[in-house]
A protein has these predicted regions:
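Lipid interaction determinants
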Residues: 2-3, 13, 18-118
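Gram-negative bacterial Sec-dependent N-terminal signal peptides
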Residues: 8-9
Length: 118
């Protein structure tokens, strides 16, 4: 009896890919998760962050403001001097993962309200 390890590996990759895709949040889920909340986390390219997301689409950070929106099933940010940048989002409870071009680029923890008083 012979076992086809390639078939098993292929099946495992398909299953993992399906799980990853299923975990991406929808537009309404993103809005519900972030509106009126603060997210503390770390981005691979820029390091630690804390941002408060208002219902009217403003992002408040320690020393800056920006705009946020949801377009389709992506969250978009427009920081001063930069073009709009949209990302996929994975949400699990109070945890968020920012995904760009299929790769995780950062993560954070969602906290109720504006504890930093931004």
């Amino acid at each position: 009896m012979s076992f086809d390890y390639r078939a098993l590996a292929t099946a495992a990759l398909v299953a993992i890919s399906s799980l990853a895709l299923a975990a991406m949040a929808s537009g309404p889920e993103i809005k519900t998760a972030v509106t009126g909340k603060t997210i503390h986390g770390n981005m691979d390219s820029t390091g630690p962050y804390a941002e408060y997301y208002t219902a009217d689409g403003v992002v408040h950070g320690k020393d800056y403001k920006a705009k946020w929106s949801v377009e389709g099933d992506k969250m978009c940010w427009t920081y001063e001097g930069s073009p709009k940048d949209c990302w996929d989002v994975e949400i699990s409870g109070d945890q968020v993962r920012w995904v760009k071009d299929g790769k995780s680029q950062g993560s954070g923890t969602i906290v109720e309200g504006n504890p930093n008083n931004f």
